[in-house]
From Swiss-Prot:
Pfam families according to UniProt: Pyr_redox_2
InterPro entries with a match to the protein in the record: FAD/NAD-bd_sf, FAD/NAD-binding_dom, NDH-2
Cofactor: FAD
Keywords: Cell inner membrane, Cell membrane, FAD, Flavoprotein, Membrane, NAD, Oxidoreductase, Transmembrane, Transmembrane helix
Record note on disruption phenotype: Deletion of the gene does not affect virulence in mice. Deletion of the gene does not induce any major redox perturbation in M.tuberculosis. Non-essential, can be deleted without causing any adverse effects in vitro. The ndh-ndhA double knockout could not be obtained, suggesting that at least one type II NADH dehydrogenase is required for M.tuberculosis growth.
Residues bound to FAD: 21-25, 89, 323, 334-335
Name this polypeptide is given: Type II NADH:quinone oxidoreductase NdhA
Gene: ndhA
Spans traversing the lipid bilayer: 389-409
Organism this protein belongs to: Mycobacterium tuberculosis (strain ATCC 25618 / H37Rv)
């Protein structure tokens, strides 16, 4: 079934803006056009606006998924010039100026006058996608809930294990990737074990768990520089996190992981719970855009190499923002997406008023507001311009910044309350786990494989019938 979400603009009709994605770039673009004389269609494959920087707190039981992922439709319900569509974009026709999305068996074709592509990024396993079965990433709510099930489930399995080696394996946690997400996850697993779970088991001592932070790079938090990276590493090591650098993961399976050292030697770590926080790849829409335009290229991560005004070459009405765009010096962080969205919407407002000259647009300029990473309760590292600081005040700055960027007063109050319980005491309010959290991904993968197998068999049978008839 194919539906149309709008007709081509009549002469003098309202300008139609299509936004793909409901992350930082997509949501901020929609809100920035609130008072503009435009009709907006926001298309997203999820129903929520996800605050990704706090996913690790969902995985470690501090926050609920609702605290960091309010419903996009409800956020924008008072903005009457926005329509929200749930669906996965499977085609962008730059010549016809349409976006095709699919939800179940329904296909929707949405025309546009201006397009903002803010589809974000996904976890990258550097060509080893089979690792995902045993080492979930940290990009979606599903990822975070699965990891919560695996982390807490590892302690439960260790409690009933009677084999010493198996118990040690269950209590070994490996986090791959020493960027902000990896550092934060490793620190929170330690705090979960030492504070929240203290005294809750009878045959194991949770604080005796082994937490390993791995990275192929030679330093922790490379983008933040050697000084802050070293401070973060020392703090982690003080918490008994084993920081292992220059260590490349070459294999991941149910029992553990295999690592290749800098000198070429390999070693094995037996572990039950693996967290993949290393590397991102742009949405497949980047490749789709490049293939549909003349002269547009993508980089190795799949990001679109945009023009200075964030547009696709030859298409001054098509903007790419956030993790999907490649602009030298602009990191893949929330601020890059937000600033890119504001720039694109400013240009669109000029277009609507007839004041835009594509050949003379001011280029996008990124203002670096700094970066932060929390390590543990009362400890973080922060970089703001040339200023670098760590410890308690960096942690306070981290708290304030994340509260400001959470969408909605309800979510801010809920997060503040949960943080108060967790940081001033031991408790965490989101410790429930279910079998669905742990096994749903695997079951869905198996079902998809079975469906593909059935489809292939049907196609082969049809082909055989045609040959017999011909």
């Amino acid at each position: 079934m194919t539906l149309s979400s709008g007709e081509p603009s009549a002469v003098g009709g309202r300008h139609r803006v299509v936004i793909i994605g409901s992350g930082f770039g997509g949501l901020n673009a929609a809100k920035a056009l609130k008072r503009a004389d435009v009709d907006i269609t926001l298309i997203s494959k999820t129903t929520t606006h996800l605050f990704q920087p706090l996913l690790y707190q969902v995985a470690t039981g501090i926050l609920s998924e609702g605290d960091i992922a309010p419903t996009t439709r409800l956020i924008l319900r008072r903005q009457k010039n926005v329509r929200v569509l749930l669906g996965e974009v499977n085609a962008i026709d730059l010549k016809a100026q349409t976006v095709t999305s699919k939800l179940m068996d329904m296909t929707t074709v949405t025309p546009y006058d201006s397009l903002i592509v803010a589809a974000g990024a996904q976890q990258s396993y550097f060509g080893n996608d089979e690792f995902a079965t045993f080492a979930p990433g940290m990009k979606t709510i599903d990822d975070a809930l699965e990891l919560r099930g695996r982390i807490l489930g590892a302690f439960e399995a260790a409690e009933v294990s009677t084999d010493h080696a198996e118990r040690e394996r269950r209590l070994t946690f490996v986090v791959v990737g020493a960027g902000p997400t990896g550092v934060e996850v490793a620190g929170q697993i330690v705090e979960l074990a030492e504070r929240t779970l203290a005294g809750a088991f009878r045959t194991i001592t949770p604080s005796e768990c082994r937490v390993i932070l791995l990275d192929a790079a030679p330093a922790v938090l490379p983008p933040m520089g050697p000084k802050l990276g070293l401070k973060a590493q020392r703090r982690l090591e003080k918490m008994d996190v084993e920081v292992q650098l220059n260590a490349m993961v070459t294999a991941v399976d149910y029992k553990g992981i295999t690592i290749k050292e800098k000198d070429g030697g390999e070693r094995r770590i037996e572990c039950a719970c693996k967290v993949w926080a290393a590397g991102v790849a742009a949405s497949p829409l980047g490749k789709m855009i490049a293939e549909g335009s003349d002269g547009t290229e993508i980089d190795r991560a799949g990001r679109v190499i945009v023009e200075p005004d964030l547009t696709v070459k030859g298409h001054p009405n098509v903007f790419v923002v956030g993790d999907l765009m490649f602009v030298p010096g602009v990191p893949g962080v929330a601020q890059g997406a937000i600033q890119g969205a504001r720039y694109a919407t400013t240009v669109i407002k000029h277009m609507v008023k007839g004041n835009d000259d594509p050949a003379n647009r001011k280029p996008f300029h990124y203002f670096n507001k700094g970066s932060m990473a929390t390590i543990s309760r009362h400890s973080a590292v922060a970089q703001v311009g040339k200023l670098e600081f760590a410890g308690y005040f960096a942690w306070l700055a981290w708290l304030v910044l994340h509260l400001v960027y959470l969408v909605g007063y309800r979510n801010r109050i809920a997060a503040l309350f949960a943080w108060g319980i967790s940081f001033m005491g031991r408790a965490r309010g989101q410790m429930a786990i279910t079998s669905q959290m742990i096994y749903a991904r695997l079951v869905m993968t198996l079902m998809e494989q079975q469906a593909q197998g059935a489809l292939a068999a049907a196609e082969q049978a049809e082909h055989a019938e045609q040959e017999a008839a011909g």
